[in-house]
Amino acid sequence: MKLVLAHNIGDINHENYSTRSMIYNCPYPIGFDGVYKSVYDNQDVLEGKSGIFFVMGDYVGKDNSFEYPNEVPVLEQYCTWEQIQEMCDKYDFKIGWHTWGHPDLTQVSRHEMVQQITPPFPMDYFAYPYGRYNKVVLDCVQQAGFKEAWSVNQGSMNENDPDYIFKQFRPYL
């Protein structure tokens, strides 16, 4: 399955026509790397779309202050489990796992890796934090029972690049 990542999509409000237009016109399923509350508040943009909401267990209902401290501005709150489930029930979206705390899995012990990769309930889809993985990470993800795992195609991550919002995920398992 081709899946396009809606990266840093914290601003899909009604005034942000550029982002909304990109979502409306995207012909592929969309993966949300973390699900900001603005997605829930402006969920009309999901009508007729499908995809995966990749959640980080420790940050559901919290903000993104954990990510690149002092480098990335705190955007807003992530959705709660209830909000994510409501959108999954209403639209053609699934819940995928993005670890508990979003660590670089290539830099943690195998014990911590297994803890981070293990979701709170069975899920079919996994996204590697920061897009990083190695053989040990691949093995742990496979042993956790995921059917598909995705890594962001890093490419250019310049916010002035028109492809900044959407980066293609690639399945690895």
Name each model-derived stretch:
Residues 56, 100, 153-154:
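Proline- and acidic/polar-enriched loop/turn elements at helix boundaries
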